[in-house]
Amino acid sequence: LTLLDQNQIISPNKHFRLFATSNTVGLGDTTGLYHGTQQINQGQMDRWSIVSTLNYLPNDHEMDIVLSKLPSMSSNEGKKIISRMIAVAELTRNAFVNGDISTVMSPRTVINWAQNLEIFKDIAFSFRVTFLNKCDELERTTVAEFFQRCFDQELPESLMSSTDINSKAKDE
């Protein structure tokens, strides 16, 4: 690093590393999921000698992160609930990758869901206000089915018939 105005050169420590993150790998966003991102020019991209893709953590690591934020859920019952929450998240992630839904549940969302569960004491309501209400209305049935698979509990959104959804789509 050169500080021209001070006529000084700063040498980095031998262990110095610089990391950057990008949801679009510098390519910009045509999907609208990351509004406001810009494409990075090739000169800038060429300065990064290593580019790596990081996917979601294994379930047990995600569990550890959630429990670190919510130690009150460390009981066997709490861990069972968090495990099911992570299973719902994994279903949304797979559906997102397959193009079936446009909203994905991040580990941050799982933490928020667990925190809301502590507040509201209702797994379905906390799911709805944390994640389901953020989903496209036409995709809520699919997402509600993921919840039903993992918690064996029906949500009103999962009971909507495809006819109801198609009528809403036509009305818009």
Predicted regions and their residues:
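C-terminal regulatory/interaction module of P-loop NTP-utilizing enzymes
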Residues: L1-E172
